[in-house]
């Protein structure tokens, strides 16, 4: 790899990432070594009816807990999705569970109708930049007694436009999660 250090360390287990991450620039953002992403002007876009500066974010997969979402917000992402949770603790699939994905095209894209879509894409542990990954965590979850307070801290750390969406939707999502799973 290069000097670039991803915020999720693929050489560590999910549990180690949860306990020790995030890494790289995201860790620097948590320490305050990187200026917080602040809105300099009114929001320019919206996402699900909530004003945001840029409707671009990070999906739930690698944002394991409040430290990861807070770092994402501080790095300037307006949409940081907290890792999917369950109504009870659930372990992660065995390590290794992240692979680098290498489409054959020079720009890394997949073309509709290409043989690669039928035959498959090379996936291995060769993490070259630019990097694309695929994971199979298995929807792990901490016990609700742990993740619910952590999620509240994540919401509290969100800034304008980010916090409003979370406050409007998280309580409803927590209720649905608790009702949907045994």
Kindly give the residue locations of the regions a language model identified.
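Short beta->alpha connector loops
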Residues: 60-66
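N-terminal basic, low-complexity leaders that serve as flexible interaction/assembly modules and, when applicable
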Residues: 1-59
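Residue-level preference for alpha-helix termini and adjacent loops
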Residues: 46-51, 55, 61, 84, ...
């Amino acid at each position: 790899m290069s000097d670039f250090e991803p915020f999720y360390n693929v050489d560590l287990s999910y549990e180690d990432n949860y306990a020790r991450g995030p890494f790289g620039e995201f860790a620097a953002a948590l320490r305050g070594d990187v200026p917080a992403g602040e809105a300099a002007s009114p929001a320019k876009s919206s996402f699900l009816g909530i004003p945001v500066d840029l409707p671009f974010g990070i999906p739930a997969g690698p944002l394991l807990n409040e430290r990861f979402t807070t770092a994402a917000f501080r790095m300037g992402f307006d949409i940081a999705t907290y890792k999917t949770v369950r109504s009870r603790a659930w372990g992660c699939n065995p390590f290794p569970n992240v692979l680098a994905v290498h489409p054959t095209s020079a720009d890394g894209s997949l073309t509709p109708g290409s043989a690669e879509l039928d035959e498959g894409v090379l996936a291995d542990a060769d993490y070259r930049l630019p990097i694309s990954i695929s994971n199979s965590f298995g929807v792990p979850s901490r016990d609700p007694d742990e993740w619910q307070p952590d999620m509240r801290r994540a919401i509290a750390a969100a800034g304008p436009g980010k916090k409003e969406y979370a406050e409007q939707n998280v309580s409803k999502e927590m209720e649905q999660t608790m009702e949907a799973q045994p």
